[in-house]
């Protein structure tokens, strides 16, 4: 996870656990740490309703970056989103923001710790979503959001081409 100055902190990093079954996996964290312009993980939400998706994400990341006080998101990705979320009696600001890199979400925690996640579209086919999660999780180097956007576009184009062949 990143500190305000862009450096990474190992403290609070998630412990390595047995991987979730592939068909159930919705979140992957970078094992390579992070760097400027790179993501800390990838997330494949089940819907485009940020209000229903955010509570679980906040609960998970609060353990790693401290109490989350603000979430910024790319409004293009979500059909509906709350302006705030209440967790344990505290308000969390949820703000649309034209992110530097599309298809990302930022979580701001305590002590200037943040997490930036690449968001795989909820409607993405499972095979593409899992390839994106694997790319982030298995990379030996931090992965830039721009690289993920490019790879997602390539995988989507390949899937569309295969679908056209199957339709013939």
Residue ranges of model-derived segments:
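Short hinge/gating elements
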Residues: 39-43
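Short acidic, glycine-rich loop/turn motifs
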Residues: 31, 75, 109-111
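N- and C-terminal low-complexity/disordered segments
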Residues: 31, 55, 163-164
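Short, well-structured hydrophobic secondary-structure segments
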Residues: 44-85
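N-terminal secretory-pathway/extracellular module detecting exported/lumenal segments
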Residues: 1-11
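N-terminal, Lys/Arg- and Ser/Thr-rich interaction peptides
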Residues: 9-38
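Helix-rich interaction surfaces within compact, conserved domain-sized segments
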Residues: 3, 79-168
């Amino acid at each position: 996870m990143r500190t305000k100055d862009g450096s990474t902190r190992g403290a609070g990093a998630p412990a390595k656990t047995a991987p979730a079954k592939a068909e159930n996996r919705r979140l992957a964290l970078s094992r390579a740490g992070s760097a400027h312009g790179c993501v800390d993980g990838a997330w494949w939400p089940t819907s485009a309703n940020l209000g229903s998706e955010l509570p679980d994400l906040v609960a998970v990341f609060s353990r790693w970056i401290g109490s989350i006080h603000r979430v910024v998101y790319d409004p293009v990705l979500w059909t509906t989103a709350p302006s705030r979320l209440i967790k344990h009696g505290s308000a969390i600001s949820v703000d649309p923001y034209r992110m530097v890199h599309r298809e990302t979400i930022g979580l701001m925690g305590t002590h200037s710790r943040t997490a930036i996640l690449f968001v795989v579209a909820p409607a993405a086919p499972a095979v593409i979503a899992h390839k994106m999660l694997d790319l982030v999780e298995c990379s030996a180097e931090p992965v830039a959001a721009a690289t993920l956007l490019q790879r997602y576009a390539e995988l989507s184009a390949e899937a569309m081409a295969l679908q056209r062949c199957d339709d013939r």
